[in-house]
């Protein structure tokens, strides 16, 4: 699973629950969810998303009410390198009046699903569970016939 470590001073030095699926906001009336997901991938990581047939893993609602639609694609041919991370501006230190730019994410890497679980933001773990269920249903187990 390709996950990205969130950038900025708050996330610096944190690992557990500090990684995220590349994602972002969109207007559902003017942009289909998959187009938005591909655009956000490009904006956050600075590279084109992998080519292939995308699967809609589901739409998940965070405790904040934010809705995230997650897609998966076979990315085995996708190299997790050459990223140019998007940036955001933040007053830092707080109440200092100084604005600084920070990367939206500071690194991205492939992780086995079990290693990704504790590192993913808690609100995104249901998406990981859905991905695991999808993979289990779509990949025949060795030695079994039907």
Feature map (PLM): residue ranges:
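Residues that flank catalytic or metal-binding motifs in active/ligand-binding sites
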Residues: 17, 67, 104
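Short loop segments at secondary-structure junctions
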Residues: 7-8, 74-78, 113-115
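Residues that scaffold the ATP/ADP-binding catalytic core of kinase and kinase-like folds
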Residues: 13, 29, 119
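N-terminal strand-loop-strand
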Residues: 1-22, 49, 71
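Charged phosphate-binding loop/patch that engages nucleotide di/tri-phosphates or the phosphate backbone
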Residues: 109, 113-146
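The catalytic Nudix box helix
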Residues: 21-57, 112
């Amino acid at each position: 699973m390709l996950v990205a470590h969130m950038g900025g001073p708050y996330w610096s030095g944190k690992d557990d629950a500090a990684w995220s699926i590349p994602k972002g906001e969109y207007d559902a009336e003017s942009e289909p969810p998959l187009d938005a997901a591909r655009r956000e991938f490009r904006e956050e990581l600075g590279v084109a998303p992998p080519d292939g047939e995308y699967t809609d893993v589901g739409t998940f609602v965070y405790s904040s009410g934010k809705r995230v639609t997650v897609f998966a694609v076979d990315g085995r041919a996708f190299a997790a390198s050459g990223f140019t991370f998007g940036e955001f501006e933040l007053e830092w230190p707080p109440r200092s009046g100084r604005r600084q730019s920070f990367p939206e994410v500071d690194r991205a890497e492939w992780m086995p699903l079990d290693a990704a679980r504790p590192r993913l933001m808690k609100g995104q773990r249901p998406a990981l569970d859905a991905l695991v269920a999808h993979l289990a249903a779509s990949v025949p187990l060795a030695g079994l016939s039907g």
